[in-house]
Regions:
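Conserved acidic donor-binding segment of nucleotide-sugar-dependent glycosyltransferases
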Residues: 290-302, 308-316
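Conserved donor-binding/catalytic core segment of Leloir-type glycosyltransferases
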Residues: 6, 164-182, 188-192, 204
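Acidic donor-binding loop of glycosyltransferase active sites
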Residues: 242-260, 275
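Nucleotide-activated donor-binding/catalytic signature segment of Leloir-type glycosyltransferases, i.e.
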Residues: 213-238, 246
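Donor nucleotide-sugar binding/catalytic pocket of nucleotide-sugar-dependent glycosyltransferases
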Residues: 102, 124-160
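Short His-centered aromatic/hydrophobic patch
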Residues: 77-83, 101
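Short hydrophobic beta-strand element within catalytic cores of glycosyltransferases
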Residues: 267, 271-272, 276-279, 289
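Single conserved hydrophobic/aromatic residue that forms the stacking wall/gate
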Residues: 324-333
Length: 333
């Protein structure tokens, strides 16, 4: 079945949705064409003339041309924003339309009165909606009668097994975009307090984003060692995870819950390396762990402090949780 995937999030663009869509496309068994902006790269990509696809007449003509040239049978919108503008406009093409909804991108739209009606009407026009977490699925069930299918998310299983030395310092890591909602500053502050209280800890940070200068300045005045990493080469992320003892990314919801963590692929990446994972209290993040067995939920600086202190004082638990990751690698994704 030939599928047209419409997306503004694709390689080489960075971010959780881009990573998810590229991985999803790589594992899609039937034929597909990726309609993406003019900067997108890939063997199945047909580039728009635009840097961003939102539903203009030009975009409709380009989509119509792709459908006719490649005998497209179904359309898959890879995200809800701004693809919801396209749904009703594409109805005249007579093809079934599906959509992947990841998380907060739809919740924010649905809170804006001027576009809320258009958005909900678009959802009703879809054949099915796929989502990555139970949390997002429940949110969607409140606003549409279209069938919601949990598609989940996943990462490649990793055979790496870390050797543990209980006498060494604890190396904590966070991998994320540098934005306020990810609360990386909480992690820096918590490890500073731990170091001041006599716990030998190091923080490794992998990522990019608008708060980079702020986070580096905060790190400069912190007592613990802080190292920043970037994806200079294809092995950078692999090396980053292999150096860690513990992973934390305390994502927090904003705007009274309208902006939240849909799931969090970085949690699954860390788990694939056998790392205990401290997840935030936002959205579907908690679905990536078995609380108390493969990680914990942390919703404040104090909780981050307490959780890291626990693993520092009980380093044998790091190995125990790692073995659980190895024995239960697919639960639930």
């Amino acid at each position: 079945m030939k599928t047209l995937v419409i997306t503004n999030d694709y390689f080489p663009k960075k971010g959780g949705i881009s990573t998810y869509i590229k991985s999803f496309e790589d594992h899609l068994e039937f034929e597909k064409i990726i309609y993406a902006p003019n900067w997108a790269e890939g063997p199945n990509v047909v580039n728009s003339k635009s840097r961003f696809i939102f539903g203009s007449r030009t975009h409709l003509r380009e989509i119509n041309q792709i459908i006719n040239q490649h005998n497209i049978e179904i359309i898959l919108h890879a995200s809800s924003n701004p693809q919801f503008y396209l749904v009703n406009k594409l109805k005249n093409f007579g093809l079934k339309q599906y959509m992947i909804i990841h998380g907060a991108e739809f919740n924010v739209i649905d809170s804006i009165p001027i576009v809320k009606k258009i958005f909900r009407r678009s959802l009703e026009s879809l054949e099915k909606i796929f989502t990555v977490s139970y949390f997002t699925g429940r949110k969607l069930q409140e606003i549409t009668s279209t069938e919601i299918v949990l598609m989940g998310a996943g990462v490649e299983k990793n055979e790496y097994q870390k050797e543990f030395n209980e006498n060494e310092k604890l190396i904590v890591g966070v991998s994320s975009r540098f934005v306020s909602r990810k609360k990386i500053d909480w992690v820096i502050d918590s490890l500073n307090d731990l170091q001041m209280d006599g716990y030998d800890v190091t923080l490794n940070i992998f990522g990019y984003g608008k708060l980079e200068k702020y986070l580096k300045k905060l790190s400069d005045i912190s007592s613990q060692e802080v190292n920043f990493y970037s994806d200079d080469d294809e092995n950078a992320l692999d090396s980053f995870y292999k150096d860690l003892d513990l992973f934390v990314m305390p994502a927090k919801s904003r705007f009274f819950g309208r902006e939240y963590e849909g799931l969090g692929l970085v949690y699954l990446e860390a788990a694939s390396y056998g790392l205990p994972v401290l997840v935030g209290s936002s959205g579907g993040a908690f679905e990536t762990i078995i609380p108390g067995k493969t990680g914990f939920i942390v919703g404040s600086r104090n909780e981050i402090y307490d959780a890291i202190k626990y693993f520092y004082e009980n380093k044998d638990m790091i190995k125990d949780l790692s073995l659980i990751h190895i024995s239960e690698p697919t639960r639930p994704y």
